[in-house]
């Protein structure tokens, strides 16, 4: 059975965002991750693609530490790819 339910990521109390986990978004994310040599710029682009520009701007205004931003990014990738946070974290920390 097909489901159009979108995963949600909760950043703080009252700050929840639906993750766009469509096939087209995943294709754009994969392309961005492969083509971009700047890891931070690629992470920003993924957040924009998966959560939308408004959510990205709200998150930017929070001035998260890099460690927290990485946690957010891994959570988004887990939601997009329908994997557990731990699986994505393991892959993210493994050099390619």
What are these regions (language model features)?
Residues 2-6, 12-96:
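Short, surface-exposed, charged amphipathic helix/loop patches that serve as local interaction elements
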């Amino acid at each position: 059975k097909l489901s159009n339910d979108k995963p949600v990521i909760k950043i703080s109390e009252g700050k929840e965002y639906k993750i766009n986990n469509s096939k087209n978004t995943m294709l754009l994310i994969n392309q961005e991750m492969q083509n971009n040599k700047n890891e931070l710029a690629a992470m920003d682009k993924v957040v924009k693609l998966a959560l939308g520009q408004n959510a990205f701007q709200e998150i930017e205004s929070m001035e998260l530490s890099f460690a927290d931003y990485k946690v957010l990014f891994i959570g988004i990738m887990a939601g997009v790819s329908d994997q557990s946070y731990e699986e994505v974290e393991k892959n993210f920390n493994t050099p390619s």
